[in-house]
Design a protein with these regions (language model features):
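Carbohydrate-active catalytic/glycan-binding domains of CAZyme proteins
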Residues: 1-218
């Protein structure tokens, strides 16, 4: 089981989800595996929880990059929801998408729903009016050279948020969190892995609400 997997505890059993990878490629040739244990010592292979498919038109075509799978249980719907970092087949790490799948049982099988960037057209809720005014002045053409002090300052002010506003924010390494009130959150590296964003999920955990914050910009 590679690094980046996630453990869910449900009804007396721990379920461990992770990428299935081989020695010859970092691409997903099988999908997401699941193991179960009642004592965290003895583990049972539950098989493939989410399978990639032999269809190049699918977002989860065999050969895509599928990483960091995490599963949470939705008490309202009775469904198990998996989110993961997804890169489209043959596109390297350019897509920076979040994928979501759902199942009636902890170990699956999970049904893939969709993938995409996060919260297209939405600004962070912790970006106040003054910050938005500054954002409007940022022009990417003025910061074509990365890693300069000026570029770093512009990133802190939201240069990449603005760049990705229409298409949605990048989502790579990620986890999920369910609060005591049942509200769930998607926590992920964004903005070329230079910031952390925390995005609220819908009541069914299958989409984003548009509410998110930026944490610790570079």
């Amino acid at each position: 089981m590679p690094s980046g997997g996630g453990v869910m505890y449900y009804d007396g059993t721990y379920y461990w989800f992770g990428e299935n990878k081989c020695d010859t490629t970092s691409s997903a040739m099988v999908g997401v595996m699941c193991y179960s244990s009642r004592n965290l010592t003895d583990w049972k292979n539950e098989g493939v929880a989410l399978s990639v498919v032999d269809n190049d038109s699918s977002d989860i075509a065999r050969g895509c990059i599928l990483e960091r799978p995490k599963v949470i249980y939705n008490a309202k719907t009775g469904k198990f929801v998996m989110w993961f970092h997804l890169e489209l087949k043959g596109k390297g790490y350019a897509a920076a998408r979040a994928g979501v799948a759902v199942s009636d049982t902890p170990a699956g099988p999970y049904r893939f729903i969709r993938s995409g960037r996060v919260n297209a057209g939405k600004l962070p809720v912790n970006m106040d009016g003054q910050a938005v005014a500054v954002l409007d002045t940022l022009n990417a053409k003025n910061y074509e050279k990365w890693w300069t002090p000026e570029w770093t300052d512009a990133v802190n002010k939201g240069l990449i948020v603005k760049r990705d506003l229409d298409g949605g924010q990048m989502s790579r390494d990620m986890t999920l969190y369910v609060d005591e009130d049942g509200k769930a959150y998607h926590i992920y590296s964004s903005e070329e892995n230079l910031t952390l964003q925390i995005a609220e999920l819908s009541d069914d955990y299958l989409s984003h609400t548009g509410n998110y914050v930026r944490v610790a910009p570079a």
